[in-house]
Amino acid sequence: MVHAFLIHTLRAPNTEDTGLCRVLYSCVFGAEKSPDDPRPHGAERDRLLRKEQILAVARQVESMCRLQQQASGRPPMDLQPQSSDEQVPLHEAPRGAFRLAAENPFQEPRTVVWLGVLSLGFALVLDAHENLLLAEGTLRLLTRLLLDHLRLLAPSTSLLLRADRIEGILTRFLPHGQLLFLNDQFVQGLEKEFSAAWPR
């Protein structure tokens, strides 16, 4: 099961950019409770805990992405927004997976699958035993759909104004955090359904 999906900023490697990694969008599937914690579980406290956990994942993804780009020896990709007509080569984008130990930051061990596309990072937080190939394929599909339908890399794109469209894509392609085995024909059908509900 997927526990969270997030989109966050990526800073350019080899720069002295002191800006912080920012979570632009996150969706948590199911809540995590700590049975050993004697403090009351209020809605506000749970929300802050989830926010801290998601930010910790985003920072680690950003760090992994920067390390991978530096280690590859390739020149850093231009992180400036592109025109909406340009296709982004997802097969060349930095990607990876890593494990999170229990209590760091989640109660249970988790696996994170991530993909860095220019100035944006996309990540899925999964159960530790989840199918990584299926998760990577799902993340690539979600990323492609979000980039195509929402034009996320175009200048002046605001994710805050498009949260309902992101949720529409997640509802169809990652329902309740469940990874789906999808063939191309089924994906095309879901894309047509989404396009009819949310015209570009």
UniProtKB/Swiss-Prot annotation:
Keyword line: Cytoplasm, DNA damage, DNA repair, Endosome, Lysosome, Membrane, Protein transport, Transport
Topological type in the membrane: Peripheral membrane protein
Name under which the protein is recorded: AP-5 complex subunit sigma-1
Gene (UniProt): AP5S1
Cellular component terms (Gene Ontology): AP-5 adaptor complex; AP-type membrane coat adaptor complex; cytosol; late endosome; late endosome membrane; lysosomal membrane; lysosome; nucleoplasm
Broad class of the protein's primary localization: cytoplasm
Pfam families, per the entry: AP-5_subunit_s1
Subunit (UniProt): Probably part of the adaptor protein complex 5 (AP-5) a tetramer composed of AP5B1, AP5M1, AP5S1 and AP5Z1. Interacts with ZFYVE26 and SPG11.
PANTHER family linked to this entry: AP-5 COMPLEX SUBUNIT SIGMA-1
Subcellular location: Cytoplasm, Cytosol; Late endosome membrane; Lysosome membrane
Function: As part of AP-5, a probable fifth adaptor protein complex it may be involved in endosomal transport. According to PubMed:20613862, it is required for efficient homologous recombination DNA double-strand break repair.
GO biological process: double-strand break repair via homologous recombination; endosomal transport; protein transport; vesicle-mediated transport
Superkingdom of source: Eukaryota
